[in-house]
From Swiss-Prot:
One of its GO terms (cellular component) is ubiquitin ligase complex. Residues 8-54 form the F-box domain. This is F-box protein pof12. Gene3D superfamilies: 1.20.1280.50. One of its GO terms (biological process) is ubiquitin-dependent protein catabolic process. Its main location: nucleus. The gene is pof12. Interacts with skp1.
């Protein structure tokens, strides 16, 4: 390994976690050389900001020479990282749209009017405090399939969370109201207000006519939606879970022995190790909740993190967590001797910025997005041995915003990710829809 004595502190270019991943296998001689380059090595430990933002902050007309040196180091580092992580470059074409412009409404401006988006296959459901609409990805554009306006007495605040199961779309509003909309091929059905809760939902999932959600006051509800006249919503179970963080994943499993099963995955802190995830299983029927149990970890291979997961997603028996230390953790839930256990499968390395959100799809692929969309990874898990760490196929999208460099410092959250064939749909909190057509 070659070093430049005149180089700047590596902490001004890379994050501490990135250095740990890349330099994990360096010899003692190489580490000594790095220490000679930077005497203030402790500053790397104290720094947690992403190297990409630091790199961009160095750019300016008065610092072209410095920019050139950092750019050279960045290229050299990316080459080293490719050899270390076995990533591959993906070819992709970016198509960018903005829903408020497509809606062509004067009210669809401002942060409060941007609303919430939900992706399902190649469709995008958009909802704000004015209307709900369904958009379909056709070629390089978005086509409106259906649109319906809310009555003033129905919606008085914007949406906080949405979930979709077959033809039923449930919307949790910020004022605590829970709405139900039937989705048809030609449009939307009647919008009905099922119930009003004390606070808004922060997580929501549905299966058949059952709903499970976590409210902002740490109450977990298991509900049944009755389509008959009279009571629209029946409470099967209510639990106060004060220890659960707001970042949770709720997933319904297939029915067994006449009972429904729902899993709630949440961040959990262990004093002896650090942050991990725990899972609570609830078994219920149309009358009540029968039982609940907590999944156990295999102590031999439990994986900890220094910070809680920024996003949790569950598909089937697989649990996927996104972490600010540039990694994803893949785990699997299994049952043995009447016990639920969580087994660690591998830590997926490939990001250069903290991972904000990731999703596992039925086709066996994972799509993960970094903070501010600095980079996007596609992981192909098809016909892969889950016992080993999976190598990523990476789509590098450094100019994903297609705007001035200063926009990278602006906080922009990813609301949802969709994957349909070879198309990735990413919805952002500022109203933009990013579409990527990639070839593997």
């Amino acid at each position: 390994m070659t070093t430049d004595v005149k180089a700047k502190n590596p902490a001004s270019i890379f994050s501490h976690e990135t250095l740990l991943h890349v330099l994990n296998d360096l010899s003692a001689h190489d580490l000594a050389a790095l220490e000679r380059v930077s005497r203030s090595w402790n500053s790397i430990v104290r720094r947690s900001s992403v190297w990409h933002n630091l790199y961009l902050s160095e750019f300016g007309t008065k610092h072209l020479r410095r920019h050139g040196r950092i750019e050279k180091k960045r290229r050299n580092w990316k080459g080293l990282f490719r050899r270390q992580s076995n990533w591959k470059d993906g070819r992709c074409k970016k198509v960018e749209s903005m829903l408020p412009q497509l809606l062509n409404s004067e009210k669809s401006v401002g942060e409060d009017r941007l609303g919430l988006t939900l992706t399902h296959q190649n469709n995008i459901y958009f909802c704000n405090d004015v209307q709900i609409s369904k958009w379909s990805s056709v070629g390089n554009s978005l086509k409106c399939q259906a649109i319906s306006s809310f009555r003033d007495e129905t919606v008085k605040s914007g949406p906080a969370v949405m979930c979709l199961d077959n033809a039923s779309l449930y919307i949790g509003l910020k004022d605590g109201n829970l709405l139900h909309v039937t989705v048809h091929e030609t449009g939307f059905g009647n919008i009905e207000n099922l119930a009003t809760f004390s606070t808004k939902f922060v997580a929501l999932s549905s299966h058949k006519n059952y709903i499970c959600g976590l409210t902002n006051d740490n109450n977990l509800y298991i509900l049944q939606h009755s389509h008959q006249a009279g009571t629209k919503l029946k409470v099967l179970g209510k639990y106060h879970v004060s220890s659960i963080e707001k970042q949770v994943a709720i997933h319904f499993q297939q029915s067994k022995e006449g009972y429904e099963v729902v899993h709630v995955v949440f961040n959990d802190y262990v004093l002896s190790g650090g942050w991990t995830v725990s899972l609570q299983e609830f078994v219920f029927n149309e009358y009540c909740v029968k039982s609940s149990r907590l999944a156990l970890h295999d102590n031999k291979d439990i994986e900890y993190s220094q910070q809680p997961a920024s996003a949790i997603f569950m598909y089937g028996s697989y649990i996927l967590t996104s972490h600010p230390d540039n990694s994803l953790i893949l785990q699997r839930l299994y049952s043995t001797n009447n016990e639920l256990r969580i087994k660690f499968l591998g830590r997926l390395l490939g990001h250069v910025c903290g991972v904000q959100i990731s999703k596992l799809f039925s086709c066996g692929r994972i799509v993960s997005v970094s903070k501010n969309c600095a980079d996007i990874c596609v992981w192909d898990l098809h016909d892969t041995n889950y016992q080993s760490i999976v190598s990523p196929l990476m789509l590098t999208c450094t100019n994903i915003h297609n705007k001035p460099v200063s926009d990278y410092e602006k906080e922009c959250k990813v609301q949802d990710i969709g994957l349909y064939e070879d198309t990735i749909l990413i919805t952002l909190s500022d109203g933009r829809i990013l579409k990527f057509l990639f070839n593997i």
